[in-house]
């Protein structure tokens, strides 16, 4: 939560420059409280696992969150019971007239396909356009983030020679970003992908700022202020055993796979993996929800119309 201090107090500008969340009494007086409405467009095969992962992170804040599960309209999932989808999910076409404070677009295990060859690509492009009028802040994750940054900026995804798989060290490139409050300078994030985005292409796209990056696996978290979006290519939301499940699955099927880097103690798969990213995962998603709370209109119907920043 923000600290409320007079705008003319020297600490106000000092803390603001350091990225600390501060709010003047006048700003606080203009800010009412209501539930934050966040949607999850779930493109992953294991729907329930993914729901739990993201709900755990955004539900850990002191704010009340209204969490809505959304699916692509025509795409039929094969890995989750139809009864579950019918009871808890709504198709995009059913929610497109609603407004959301936040939207998370998950990854999908289809990174080997060109974006245009994905069966639901046309509707997903409709979602991207819809976020500009109906969503205050959008968070694209892994393939979902790559798809968004490609759609809005033409940044391409590139196939890797070998799967980036494991827990890789990352660096905090923008310590004063409100999304990185409390972040260490150096930390690990789970990575599991066959594709990457080029830092040079991101740098060449107007309006993009890389917040987190890795010398080993490239850019990780990118801010797109013009489209009120964040794009993350790695997996802070992963459970402690998610990489283990992926590794065990591939070993059992005979698929060639390396032991995930820097995940098991001594890189020994017989040992229990250590979770060394959980605290930063909560920081990132908590900061995202907090930033939504600070900047979204009180009247949900003003989302996409009201560009006033309550901190201005």
From Swiss-Prot:
Acyltransferase recorded as keyword: yes
One cellular component term from this protein's GO annotations in UniProt: cytoplasm
Gene3D superfamilies: 3.40.50.880
Keywords annotated in UniProt: Acyltransferase, Amino-acid biosynthesis, Cytoplasm, Methionine biosynthesis, Transferase
Family annotation (HAMAP family): MetA_acyltransf (MF_00295)
Active-site residues, as the UniProt record annotates them: 142 (acyl-thioester intermediate), 235 (proton acceptor), 237
Group of enzyme by EC: transferase
GO molecular function: homoserine O-acetyltransferase activity; homoserine O-succinyltransferase activity
Binding of substrate, residues: 163, 192, 249
Family per similarity comment: Belongs to the MetA family.
Site feature Important for acyl-CoA specificity, where: 111
Protein name, as recorded: Homoserine O-acetyltransferase
Major location category of this protein: cytoplasm
Pfam families reported in the protein's UniProt record: HTS (PF04204)
Enzyme Commission number(s): 2.3.1.31
Subcellular location: Cytoplasm
Gene from which this protein is expressed: metAA
């Amino acid at each position: 939560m923000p600290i409320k201090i007079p705008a003319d107090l020297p600490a106000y500008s000092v803390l603001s420059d350091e990225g600390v969340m501060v709010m003047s009494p006048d700003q606080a007086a203009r800010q009412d409280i209501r539930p934050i409405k966040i949607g999850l467009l779930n493109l992953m095969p294991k729907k329930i696992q993914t729901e739990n992962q993201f709900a755990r992170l955004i539900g850990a804040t002191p704010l009340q969150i209204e969490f809505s599960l959304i699916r692509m309209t025509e795409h039929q999932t094969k890995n989750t019971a139809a009864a579950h989808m019918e009871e808890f999910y709504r198709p995009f076409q059913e929610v497109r007239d609603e407004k959301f404070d936040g939207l998370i677009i998950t990854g999908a295990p289809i990174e080997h396909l060109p974006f245009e060859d994905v069966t639901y690509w046309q509707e997903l492009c409709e979602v991207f356009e819809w976020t500009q009028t109906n969503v205050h802040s959008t968070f694209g994750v892994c393939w979902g983030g790559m798809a968004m940054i490609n759609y809005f900026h033409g940044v391409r995804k590139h196939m890797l020679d070998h799967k980036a798989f494991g827990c890789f060290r990352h660096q905090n490139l923008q310590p004063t970003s409100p999304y990185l409050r409390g972040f260490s300078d150096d930390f690990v994030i789970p990575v599991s992908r066959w594709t990457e985005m080029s830092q040079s292409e991101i740098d060449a796209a107007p309006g993009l700022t890389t917040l987190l990056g890795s010398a080993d696996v490239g850019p990780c978290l990118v801010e797109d202020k013009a489209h009120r979006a964040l794009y993350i290519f790695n997996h802070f939301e992963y459970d402690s055993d998610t990489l283990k499940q992926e590794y065990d699955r591939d070993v059992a099927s005979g698929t060639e796979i390396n032991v995930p880097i820097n995940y098991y103690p001594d890189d020994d798969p017989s040992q229990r993996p250590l979770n060394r990213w959980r605290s930063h995962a909560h920081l990132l998603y908590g900061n995202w929800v907090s930033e939504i709370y600070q900047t979204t209109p009180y009247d949900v119907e003003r989302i996409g119309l009201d560009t006033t920043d309550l901190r201005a």
